[in-house]
Amino acid sequence: MKLRDILALMYKIHKDSGISMPYLTGGVPRDKILGLIRDEISDLDITTGDASIHNLAKEFSISLGHQYSIDSKQMDDGHTSVYVGNLKIDFSSNFEVPSAEQILKKHGIKNPTDLQKEVFSRDFTCNTLLMTLDLKKIKDPTKQGFPDIKKKILKTCLDPDITLRYNPNRIIRVIYLASKLGFDVDPEIIEWVSKNKDFVRMSSEGYLAKNLDKALSKDPDRSVYLITKMNLWDTLPITDSLYPYYAKKSVIKGAQWRTNYDYGEGLYMNLDKYKSVSEFRRKRRKNRLKQLRKLKDMKLK
């Protein structure tokens, strides 16, 4: 079944059942703005911004199930995942942070709608964009999504103490998303995590390991830099992909070091002194050239 047919069915259910307007949110509109959508889309996030999302998920599963073999699962956090072939469709849990209305009023939104309360309760501003089901328009309800994507910075929608405290799974996603997208991380997030790192332990070790390995596969420099900046070396599980960097950081006796990690300068042991990943990479390139010149001089002698 083609994507447009799936979205057309979703729109029909919305019209016929009086369900609030559904939108694509999360990765698809974000990646569209970033120019990252090239292949077939395999993951959709859907929201209506209110409790009618649960009715949409149910009716969509029933309608599609009459024509295709599907698998529908109710997840622990309250969202519904529907699998159609290689496509996964996640229907929002409609999560709202406690006292969302009062918090938004303090931010100058006098009478926040259900959609605004749901969107501001999301993890990061880059994931709050809303795309219409005809794929023609993208809205920015927080007015923070477009600017932060343009600046390539990861920021929480509300204060990190609210956004991360109420869902600690989002902490490891800071590392994963920043590494995946090549984004810098808001210093307020880094400061909050470094002071509240015990919240990381509220996530399962399997969830942490999965996201950590995905992050390292995308951009190991950025991943290791953020782990160091947020002081998480003694909190995260040391997976096989993280171990070589942990060995460098901790100077584990007998560890098998790879000399091309720091080019003899111990860069990974002093990551906290760098202001950004870019500064670290410039220093590493400089050291690499320095090392190559030394080798060249030795050969000439």
Per-region residue spans from a language model:
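Catalytic cores of the polymerase beta-like nucleotidyltransferase superfamily
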Residues: 1-301
